[in-house]
UniProtKB/Swiss-Prot annotation:
Disulfide bonds: none annotated. GO terms for biological process: L-arginine biosynthetic process. PANTHER family: N-ACETYL-GAMMA-GLUTAMYL-PHOSPHATE REDUCTASE, CHLOROPLASTIC-RELATED, N-ACETYL-GAMMA-GLUTAMYL-PHOSPHATE REDUCTASE, CHLOROPLASTIC-RELATED-RELATED. It is found in: Cytoplasm. One of its GO terms (molecular function) is N-acetyl-gamma-glutamyl-phosphate reductase activity. This is N-acetyl-gamma-glutamyl-phosphate reductase. Pathway: Amino-acid biosynthesis; L-arginine biosynthesis; N(2)-acetyl-L-ornithine from L-glutamate: step 3/4. InterPro entries: AGPR_AS, AGPR_type-1, NAD(P)-bd_dom_sf, NAGSA_dehydrogenase, Semialdehyde_DH_NAD-bd. The active site is at C149. NCBIfam families: argC (TIGR01850). Coiled coil: none annotated.
Length: 345
């Protein structure tokens, strides 16, 4: 299969190139860029020397429509809104890693992203690519809205409770931490070494754009769920997300009941690993992989549930899940090209 990637020079795009360089069904991978066209890709990314030595090509729809079968869009918000309708008209399958197609209500997207939404018909056609929870729709889709990094960790952590209608409608708190690669490759004051090193900070307080994405999915599973409290923090590490979630339940369950519920829910999900009781995951334990590791426990003193979910933000939170969706869309084993052991230590 001939594959295109727009945004191959960003961190998410680079991970796509790395994964697809050894994917058995990737016949050819064509890399497109709005800048740097003509440059040899591996010269800018020496770790891919011998694996991705092709030249970057300009984004030209007249050429693209004759070159590829599927396009991964790993560009910033706004690019997909412009390109996706053209790609769809050309009969090209699209997997979009930006947030442009995730929020079903255009007004809600514009409120949180502060930009014009994609055409509503395109948004409505897009299937939300949370692979473990939406397999049947993904298998039939031609357009995928790949979930955000925080929503992936949070929704996988809360899905077993939400799908059983067990979440307290007014009490869901998410405290999430991410590595700096989630901010992208472009330099900024907030990601400058001297600003980030030996530091730990909260950002986008009460206005993070992943909030409505999380709420949208939760309300599909458990209608009537109220607004959540979501806080994001930046920590001085390169990769990884840890989402810690606190909630109350609508019925009485023991710690053993909860662990059994999660274990059964994900028993057929290769990439979600529910930890043994009393063992809590660390970001290092999923580094470089497509795994999501989850722990769940009950505080009997407060009767509150704590769920801990960790992912690699560039893999399960972006490129890895995109390739997982690529596999599902084509009827292949979802693990194809993704059986990458976490890098440790």
């Amino acid at each position: 299969m001939k594959i295109g990637i727009v945004g191959a020079t960003g961190y998410g795009g680079t991970e796509l190139v790395r994964i697809l360089s050894h994917h058995p069904h990737a016949e050819e991978c064509i890399l497109y860029s709005s800048s740097g066209e003509g440059n040899v890709y591996s010269e800018g990314y020496p770790h891919l020397t011998g694996l991705a030595d092709q030249q970057l090509k300009p984004i030209d729809m007249n050429t693209i429509k004759h070159e590829i079968d599927i396009m991964f869009l790993a560009a910033p918000p706004g690019v997909s809104s412009e390109l996706t309708p053209k790609l769809a008209d050309a009969g090209i399958t699209v997997i979009d890693l930006s947030g442009d197609l995730r929020i079903k209500e255009p007004a809600e997207y514009e409120k949180w992203y502060k930009r014009t939404a994609a055409p509503k018909a395109v948004i409505q056609e897009a299937v939300y690519g949370l692979a473990e929870l939406n397999q049947l729709q993904i298998q039939q889709a031609k357009l995928i809205a790949n979930p955000g990094c925080f929503p992936t960790a949070v929704l996988l952590g809360l899905a077993p409770l939400a799908q059983k209608k067990l979440l307290d409608e007014s009490f869901v708190i998410v405290d999430a931490k991410t590595g700096v690669s989630g901010a992208g490759r472009k330099a900024s004051m907030g990601t400058h070494f001297s600003e980030l090193n030996d530091n730990f900070k909260i950002y986008k307080v009460n206005e993070h754009q992943h909030t409505p994405e999380i709420e949208q999915a939760l309300n599909e599973w458990q209608p009537g769920l109220g607004p959540i409290t979501f806080s994001a923090h930046l920590v001085p590490m390169t990769r990884g997300i840890m989402a810690t979630m606190y909630t109350r339940l609508t019925c009485d369950l023991t710690a053993d009941d909860l662990h059994d519920l999660y274990s059964e829910f994900y028993q057929d999900s290769y990439f979600v690993r529910v930890r043994p009781k009393g063992q809590y995951p660390q970001t290092k334990e999923v580094y470089g992989s497509n795994f999501c590791d989850i722990a769940v426990t009950l505080d009997e003193r407060t009767n509150r549930v704590t769920i801990v979910s960790v992912i690699d933000n560039l893999m399960k939170g972006a490129a890895g899940q995109a390739v997982q969706n690529f596999n599902l869309m084509n009827g292949w084993n979802e693990e194809t090209g993704l059986t990458i052991t976490p890098i440790y230590p």
